[in-house]
């Protein structure tokens, strides 16, 4: 298939340069475009050489596509419930000629074991909906509401399926809101995933954290490393040097 046939401009789609090893992503601004949280997550994730990684709630496929160059994973699977978003992700994979390395599954993450064997995954990562179904005002646009609110999945379901997919000593990575950290830790432990590493993300170094990166290890003992905080901006609309480095600039 010709590359220009993969982008449906008549439907509002565009091709975005990820400025990372010549990678591109097909997106539709009328649906949901990736944010800095996906970029930070992909930079935080670790996959062993020739390992198998699964990205839950993959959306546009941004995390698998970035992991294809940021890690030495042999195989990466993204799972996305919204069919039109999953289709865009699949076409982005094809545009970047990554079909042999990345596959996109269009289904509910609760059905992951229909496609992936139990306890066979080295790394599971996820940038899930942050807000509970009844929390905050839902976006009237359904694709955006699904991406932001726990309408079709929830925190417990995400961590439960991660446990089922992971090998013993497999790694789990998540980005979420600090306000839900106690819930996250409780659910991880209930599912035998011990929190191992966290890093708080701040808009500015002197502001409250608004995101947190979390790493867990399945079946591990108890210890936790809190990394130095990451500030996104040094002044209004100006990224810090570390964030610029993450973006490859």
Where are these regions (language model features)?
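Class I SAM-dependent transferase core
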Residues: 7-48
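General small-molecule cofactor/ligand-binding pocket signal
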Residues: 26, 103-105, 196-199
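Residue-level signal for inorganic ion chemistry
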Residues: 41, 127, 158, 216
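Conserved SAM/SAH cofactor-binding pocket of Class I
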Residues: 44-137
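Mobile active-site "lid"/loop adjacent to the S-adenosyl-L-methionine
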Residues: 128-157
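Conserved Class I SAM-dependent methyltransferase catalytic core
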Residues: 152-209
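SAM/dcSAM-binding transferase cores
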Residues: 208-249
């Amino acid at each position: 298939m010709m590359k220009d046939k993969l982008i449906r401009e008549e439907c509002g789609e565009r091709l975005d340069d990820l400025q990372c090893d010549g990678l591109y992503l097909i997106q539709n601004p009328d649906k949901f475009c990736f944010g800095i949280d996906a970029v930070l997550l992909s930079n935080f994730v670790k996959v062993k050489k020739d390992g198998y990684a699964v990205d839950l709630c993959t959306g546009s496929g941004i995390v698998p596509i970035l992991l294809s160059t940021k890690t030495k994973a042999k195989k990466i699977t993204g799972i996305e419930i919204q069919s039109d978003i999953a289709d865009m992700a699949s076409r982005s994979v094809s545009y970047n000629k990554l079909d042999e390395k990345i596959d996109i599954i269009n289904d509910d993450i609760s059905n992951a074991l229909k496609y992936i064997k139990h306890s066979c995954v080295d790394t599971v990562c996820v940038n899930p909906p942050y807000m509970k179904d009844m929390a905050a005002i839902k976006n009237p646009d359904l694709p955006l509401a699904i991406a932001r609110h726990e309408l079709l999945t929830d925190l417990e379901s995400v961590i439960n399926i991660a446990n089922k997919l992971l090998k013993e000593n497999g790694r789990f990575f998540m980005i979420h809101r600090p306000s839900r950290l106690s819930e996250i830790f409780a659910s991880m432990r209930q599912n035998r995933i011990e929190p191992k590493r966290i890093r708080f993300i701040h808009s500015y170094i002197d502001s409250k954290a608004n995101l947190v990166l979390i790493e867990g290890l399945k079946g591990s003992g108890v210890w936790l490393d809190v990394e130095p905080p990451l500030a996104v901006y040094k002044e209004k609309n100006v990224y810090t040097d570390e964030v610029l480095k993450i973006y490859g600039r």
